[in-house]
Amino acid sequence: KTGRMSDSTPAAPVVLDLWCDLECPDCHRALDDVRALRARYGDRVEIRLRHFPLEKHKHAFAAAQAAEEAVAQGRGWPYIEALLSRTDDLGRTGEPVLLDVARELGLDTEEFDTALIDGRHLLIVDADHAEGKAIGVTGTPTYVIGDERLDGGKSQEGLRERIEEIVDRTLAARDR
């Protein structure tokens, strides 16, 4: 187990990595696409959240660590979705929002606080960020399917349709 946040079974035939900054308003808007992709493909597509905290968002790195603690407590995606719906609060109020969201979801906030202090999830966040840089991720959200990278940080326009084309083509090739 890698600790990665995934919304499907490991045997899913198509992997979609979503490189995300949890303080990024564009990543919040990308959730609609994620929900639509889940509805359309179900477990035929594994959507994995990958951390790419941007320097301009001062709470994004802590938010990524908090998200990994939510994964450890079994509520990764609900936490991510709740936190992304509060990007303005996070930017304005800072790290207390991370614990507020955990509390609202019934997670162990003491363990959250401890995880943020002891840095137990730093390696996952650092590894994601390094891998993202290595493959050319520069902004968020960025989607990667196989060797195709789609930058949603510049524009969300038509992005879901392009993702669906790639997924459909990949699934068709595997079904032959």
Where do the PLM segments sit?
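A short beta-strand-turn-helix
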Residues: K1-V15
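Generic serine detector
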Residues: S6-S8, S85, S155
